[in-house]
Structures are given as C-alpha cells and as structure tokens.
C-alpha cells in the first residue's frame, strides 16, 4: 500500500497542474494582454467618413479603397497567429441617395451568410505580424455569393470592417477583435456622391487613368487652330497621301473628305494623330484664289515629294517631236531637285526599265491626273513639231486664257500613260 499511495498522490498533482494550465490559457498569456490594433491612414479614412464613404460591389468582386491596414503590437513573437477580417452591419437601415445626401430608405434585407476573409499570410509568427502593418489589399467585395475569398455584401447597406487575431498552433482561441468606426461605408454598385469619386481619384494611384481620360476628353473638345500650319506638310493627289518626310506611296486607306477622322496605319498613327480629329480641306478653291494657285501648287508639291533617297527623277524618253509645257514660278528659294517643267513627247510615253504600264515606284497615273489645280503660269503657246496620236490635231496653239488651259490640259492628260519610277 505504501507503494501505491505515492502514485495516487502524483496523479492528483498532474491533474491539478493540467487544470491550472487550461484555466491560464483561457485567461490569456501575460505577453498577450497588451495587444493593440491601430488603424493606418486614419486621417484619410476620416475624410471619407465625413462624406459618407462608398465602396463598389460587383459580381466578380472589387477591391477596397482606401485599403484597410492596421498595425499590431503585443503579440508573442514566437507564437503562431492568424488574422481574419469580416464585415458587420453598422445599423438596421437600407440607405438611398436623395438630393445629394444619404438618407434611410426602409428596412434592411436579411443579412447574407457570414463571410470571413483569412489573410493570405496566415498562419504566421507574431514577429511577422508586428514587423509591418497588416494590409487587406486583396480582399474583394461582391454582391454575389461566389466564394474564392470574396466578401458578399448587400448593396445600399452600411457596413463596418472588423479585424480578428486568432492564436493557432495548439488550442485555437480568439485573443483580439477590433473595429474602427471611421472605416464604415455604404456598399454601392456605382458611386453616388461625386465628392467621393473625386476624393478616390485624387488619392488612389490606380484611379489616375480615369483622371487622364477625362483630361484627354477635355482637350479633344478644344478646337485646334493650328490646322493650317499642319496642313502644309501634307499633299493629297488623287488617291495618294504624301507625307513631307517619308517614302512616297499610296495611303493604307482612301482619303476621307466627309470630316470623319482618318485612321492610317504604320508609323503615321502617332506622328499625324492631330490630323485625325481636325482635318482641313485638302485642296484650296482655285476659283477664289486663282492668282496664287500656281505658287501654292508648286509649294505643296515640292514639299510633299520625298527626298532623292526614296524617289529619283522621272525618266521620260526624249524625242525630236516634243512639245513642252514650261511652268515657272516666282519662288527663287525653292531648292527641290524636281524642276517645274513637264515634257510631253510626241509619241506614246513608255516607262524606262520596265514593261509598259507597270508600276515600279508606287506612282500611278492618279498622280498626274489627280490634281484639279489651274495652271495659270503656263506659257502662252504650245508648239508641236510633229503630229501625234496623243494630241488633238486642231491644237497647235493655246491662248493665255485660263479656260483654254484647263480644257487643253484635260484633253492632254486623258491620253497620258503611266509614268514609271526608275533608279
């Protein structure tokens, strides 16, 4: 009996110690009695609180702004904890936005099933949670029960977030739970208060795109008065779009003259973006500006033609029976390598270095026939030394009248063959 009595006394002591340990764990460890949660960005949250904060809820979920962040102190650095977040109703009202303010609008809907968001870093050591503010930047608010870490909320109801800290690694127990009144918000499917929208755009770096888009739309409404200066760098000849500093070639789409924006491809999309929205008339009226038509045509044509590295001079075979259309201009500062002289042979024009009628340099007969400009600077006569099928037999001399020049040139250009570009 003397041997059994010590064993009985030992069992009694062990059970008493275990009981005391359990009671101590329920009361909390001494190192966890001073746990504190403090809200980060409290000043910003207060600004939203004064305007009645709103949070967007969508079917797929929308992240919160401001982001809920809190600093934790008083945890055991070597113990394991999980941090959770849930949302509770802040009142028993359904809200509506009337005349610029939120007012109660009836009884609330039944509360949705309680959804708890577990921080993705959970579980972790107390040292981890205390080294930096705990951020709930990935939580998403939804108006549908989708799961996947989303919190379901009823639209037009006011909520208040709560942060919970649970100790894990043994017997799980809640050691802290705290909410912050300044983080209350009304769940909405679209912002109702414009001041809330402006405040979120101002402070949310991910909302700057909305502000930039608004500024771009405002700039588009301002008329562009520099169209005349921009127009001087472009020339429209028939179906051709000729930039002043690029290779000559047809445009990717035919020119539009109905005021619609021009959408060109390639490198011209950004360089000539201003031409899309404010496009001036491609040609001046030769009836109202007849005195300056010749000079304008030469200025535009010489400015639009590409440099010698992308387009060589026109190669037209010489012939003894050749009539010349001498065109002169008063501009002496023009340094273009293409003189204002068009030579028309007495026989059929044949492209040099290629088959007849082929297009080698991207230049078609539209370049010669596309312009409707009047040639007031042409010489007074066109001597023709030999008859040709290209000329009207009755055309031996052309007067200085503008109407005669226009009708004669129309008959001449109708029989011109395509001129090929050779290198």
Swiss-Prot record:
Region described as Disordered: spans on this chain: 215-234, 280-304
Annotated compartments: Nucleus
Compositional bias ranges of the Polar residues kind: 290-304
Main subcellular location: nucleus
Disruption phenotype: Loss of notochord cells and posterior structures. Disrupts left-right development.
GO (cellular component) term, any one: chromatin
Keyword Cell membrane recorded: no
Binding region for DNA: 44-212
Record bears the keyword Transit peptide: no
Induction remarks: By mesoderm-inducing factor activin A.
Record-level GO BP terms: cell fate specification; convergent extension involved in axis elongation; convergent extension involved in nephron morphogenesis; determination of heart left/right asymmetry; determination of left/right asymmetry in diencephalon; determination of left/right asymmetry in lateral mesoderm; determination of left/right symmetry; digestive tract development
Tissue specificity of this protein: First expressed at the dorsal side of the blastula embryo. Expressed in the germ ring, shield and chordamesoderm during gastrulation and is restricted to the notochord and tailbud during somitogenesis (at protein level).
InterPro entries documented for this protein: p53-like_TF_DNA-bd_sf, T-box_DNA-bd, T-box_sf, TF_Brachyury, TF_T-box, TF_T-box_CS
Residue stretches of biased makeup (Basic and acidic residues): 215-227
Matches recorded under Pfam families: T-box (PF00907)
Highest taxon of source: Eukaryota
Annotated PROSITE patterns: TBOX_1 (PS01283), TBOX_2 (PS01264), TBOX_3 (PS50252)
Entries under CDD domains matching the protein: T-box_TBXT_TBX19-like
Cited function: Involved in the transcriptional regulation of genes required for mesoderm differentiation, including itself. Indispensable for the formation of the notochord and the tail structure. Functions together with tbx16/spadetail in development of trunk and tail mesoderm. Functions by itself early in development to repress medial floor plate and promote notochord fate but at later times, functions together with tbx16/spadetail to promote medial floor plate formation. Acts in a parallel pathway to, but cooperates with, non-canonical wnt-signaling during tail formation.
Assembly: Monomer. Binds DNA as a monomer.
Name of the featured protein: T-box transcription factor T-A
Organism from which the protein derives: Danio rerio
Gene name of this polypeptide: tbxta
């Amino acid at each position: 009996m003397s041997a059994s009595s010590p064993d009985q006394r030992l069992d009694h002591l062990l059970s008493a110690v275990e009981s005391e340990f359990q009671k101590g764990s329920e009361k909390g460890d001494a190192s966890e009695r001073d746990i504190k949660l403090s809200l980060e960005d409290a000043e910003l949250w207060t600004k939203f609180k004064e305007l009645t904060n709103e949070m967007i809820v969508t079917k797929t979920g929308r992240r919160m702004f401001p982001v809920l962040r809190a600093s934790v102190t008083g945890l055991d650095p070597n113990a394991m904890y999980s941090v959770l977040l849930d949302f509770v109703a802040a009142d028993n009202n359904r809200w509506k936005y009337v005349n610029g303010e939120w007012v109660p609008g009836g009884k609330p809907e039944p509360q949705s099933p309680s959804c708890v968001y577990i921080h993705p870093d959970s579980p972790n050591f107390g040292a981890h949670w205390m080294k930096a503010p705990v951020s709930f930047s990935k939580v998403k608010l939804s108006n549908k029960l989708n799961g996947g870490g989303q919190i379901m909320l009823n639209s037009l109801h006011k909520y208040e977030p709560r942060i919970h800290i649970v100790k894990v690694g043994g017997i799980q127990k809640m050691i802290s739970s705290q909410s912050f009144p300044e983080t209350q918000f009304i769940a909405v499917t679209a912002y109702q208060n414009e001041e809330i929208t402006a405040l979120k755009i101002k402070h949310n770096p991910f909302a700057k795109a909305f502000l930039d888009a608004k500024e771009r739309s405002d700039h588009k409404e301002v008329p562009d008065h520099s169209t005349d200066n921009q127009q001087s760098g472009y020339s429209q000849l028939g179906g051709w779009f000729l930039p002043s500093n690029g290779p000559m070639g047809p445009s990717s789409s035919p020119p539009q003259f109905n005021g619609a924006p021009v959408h060109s491809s390639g490198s011209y999309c950004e360089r000539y973006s201003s031409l899309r929205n404010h496009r001036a008339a491609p040609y001046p009226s030769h009836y109202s500006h007849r005195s300056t038509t010749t000079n304008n045509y030469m200025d535009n044509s010489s400015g639009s033609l590409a440099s010698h590295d992308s387009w060589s001079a026109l190669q037209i075979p010489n012939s003894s029976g050749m009539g010349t259309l001498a065109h002169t201009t008063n501009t002496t500062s023009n340094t273009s390598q293409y003189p204002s002289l068009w030579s028309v042979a007495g026989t059929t024009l044949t492209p040099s270095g290629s088959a007849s009628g082929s297009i080698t340099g991207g230049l078609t007969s539209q370049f010669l026939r596309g312009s409707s400009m009047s040639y007031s600077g042409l010489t007074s006569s066109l001597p023709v030394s030999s008859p040709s099928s290209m000329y009207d037999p009755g055309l031996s001399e052309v007067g200085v009248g503008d109407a005669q020049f226009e009708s004669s040139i129309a008959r001449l250009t109708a029989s011109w063959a395509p001129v090929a570009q050779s290198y």
